Each structure stands twice: as structure tokens, then as C-alpha cells.
Amino acid sequence: MNKIVLVTTKGCEGCNIMHKSIKQALECTSKKIEYVTKDVMELTKEEKSKLKTYDFPTTLFYKNDRITRREVGTRPYIVVVRWIDVDFK
């Protein structure tokens, strides 16, 4: 299963921008991809360490329950479209 997880934090404008970029990118693809946003406060200390979420927004791409991409910061939607094409062939 293909999945994108956006880890955010309260008051993060970059997180809002990345959320919009991901939503727009998902509208440009016909691939079946689950999209989830998580606030960092929902994660345990162990999850934060395992996912290496030290800065925000952190975008994680999963394919078959394995992380295939970890990106920090904001990107335009067209870059996210490219990531989808590369990671979810």
C-alpha cells in the first residue's frame, strides 16, 4: 500500500503549505495513495526517534509499510508529483 504521512506541529505555516502541496499533487495522479497528517504531539518519543522527526514539516512516503522517502521542509506541488511518480511506480 502507498501512503504519505505529513508530520506537523502547531502553528507551523510551512506545514500548512506542504499540506496544500500534497493535496494538490494527489489531485494530479490516478495512483491509489493514502494520505495522513499527524501532529508531532500524537507521536510517542520512540516514534519520533524512529521516524527521525526533528524538524517540521516532515513528509514520509511509505511503500508496503517501508519508508521510501523522508523530506523536511516545504516543496511546490509539482515536486511532490515527481516524488509520487518516482516512489510509487
What role is predicted for each listed range?
Residues M1-C28:
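Local sequence-structure signature of Cys/Sec-based thiol-disulfide redox active-site neighborhoods
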Residues V7-T9, H19, K31-K45:
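Thiol-based oxidoreductase modules, predominantly thioredoxin-like and allied folds used
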Residues E13, M41, T68:
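Nucleotide phosphate-binding site architecture
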Residues C28, K48-L51:
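Structural motif
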Residues K31, Y54, R66:
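Structured loop/turn residues at beta-strand edges in well-structured enzyme cores
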Residues K50-L60:
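Structural micro-motif
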Residues L60-K89:
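Non-catalytic, surface beta->alpha helical segment in thiol-disulfide oxidoreductase systems
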